[in-house]
């Protein structure tokens, strides 16, 4: 369940990018790269990485693209405590959701709303700063094996 847009949420200022067809990964990565002041569009990412047979982009390719831009990128099996820690340190993440059947979707995690028990995401399909109930977020994320991508600048924060 997606809750109404939050106007005063505790979240990172991650620029929002609305996705084109089958480009949620490209849009999510473009958001995070723009957060790190990289001049990149989802079209740049998609041109380099979209695989029509996957109806999108493989997660490993997102990490490779970020590294090709000089950033550090690590894909791993995450947990909620790690998400909170990284976001609390000013580092947005990309996670994959399983939406049912063979449908997967990438979103950028930008904050948390403890009062509403929600995770704040920039969802390239649904809009910026969306509050998703933590239980719904966790179920979708678990379905995708808790796949998480951390992209940061090299060196100390």
What are these regions (language model features)?
Residues 57, 102-106, 129-130:
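Extracytoplasmic/secreted cell-surface and envelope-processing proteins
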Residues 1-55, 80, 99-101, 115, ...:
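Active-site-adjacent structural segments surrounding the nucleophilic cysteine of cysteine proteases
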Residues 9-10, 22, 26, 39, ...:
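Residue-level signal for well-ordered alpha-helical segments
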Residues 25-33, 42-46, 59-66, 80, ...:
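Extracytoplasmic/secreted envelope proteins and their assembly/folding machinery
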């Amino acid at each position: 369940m997606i809750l109404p847009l939050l106007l005063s949420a505790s979240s990172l200022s991650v620029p929002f990018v609305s996705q084109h067809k089958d480009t949620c990964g490209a849009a999510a990565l473009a958001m995070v790269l723009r957060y790190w002041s990289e001049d990149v569009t989802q079209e740049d990412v998609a041109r380099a990485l979209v695989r029509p047979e996957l109806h999108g982009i493989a997660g490993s390719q997102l990490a490779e693209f970020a590294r090709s831009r000089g950033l550090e990128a690590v894909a791993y099996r995450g947990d909620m405590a790690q998400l909170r820690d990284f976001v609390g340190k000013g580092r947005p993440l990309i996670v994959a959701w399983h939406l049912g059947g063979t449908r997967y979707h990438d979103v950028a995690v930008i904050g948390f709303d403890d009062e509403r028990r929600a995770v704040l995401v920039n969802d390239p399909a649904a809009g910026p700063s969306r509050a998703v109930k933590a239980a719904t977020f966790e179920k979708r994320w678990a379905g995708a094996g808790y796949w998480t991508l951390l992209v940061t600048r090299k060196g100390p924060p």
